[in-house]
Amino acid sequence: PRELFTECYGKRISLDEDVTRNMAKIVDYVRMDENGLSLRNAIIEKYILISNKKELGDRIIDILRYVSRYVSERRNDIWYIIFQCLLKEDILENRLKLKKNDIKRIYFSVKKEYEAISYYWLQLGLYEQKVNDFVASYNYLEMSASIRPNSYKIQHALARNYLRHANYVMDYNEAKELFAEGEARMKNLIESKEFYKEKAKPFSINSYILEKIRYIQKFNIDPDKKEL
């Protein structure tokens, strides 16, 4: 985003300045559009990510700390979007290809700056869920819910954490109790008549069916006709 570039560099650098080697200009590598600054070539982007792999985690931490002064709960502006993109567990792992230990280091390095933000705890909870630490995930998701109790995404994450935990443990009695709790929570979300939850209902239905099938197959359960 151009706001981040301007905040960091002000007017010290112009897109038309000769600031790179061999008389090349910034404009040869980046462009400005309605979305802000972006690289002109995907190959350049890939090269930057690969060649700076070891520094990537530190640079993300630096930016997150830098923008933290502008980020607050329920303030959906450009700074909050930057914060969300850089903290999103799925982006860190699948797009930026960071290792799980590096992702965890990022989260805990910015805890002080974002401990009052529900999205921080949500992503930390989803990370712990990804590494199968469902107890830690539950605790972090509860922290997120304590800040934003009516958030659909947070309540969905809590419900699915129970379901995934049930499908992870080997003891049937423990799994049965966990799944029952997660199932009740997920059904409450699915059956809710609130509009903002209605929009995400298909996602919850899909998640519930997926975990239900896994549960039935893992413990060789014969579902009754009502469940089918």
Pin down the residues of each PLM region.
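C-terminal leucine-rich, beta-strand-based interaction scaffolds used for sensing/assembly
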Residues: R2-E128, F134-V135, S144
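Residue at a conserved register position within TPR or TPR-like alpha-solenoid repeats
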Residues: D90, E128, Y162, V169, ...
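Structural motif corresponding to the intra-repeat A-B loop/turn of tetratricopeptide repeats
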Residues: K97, V131, H165, V169-Y172, ...
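TPR alpha-solenoid repeat register
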Residues: Y120, I154, F195-P202
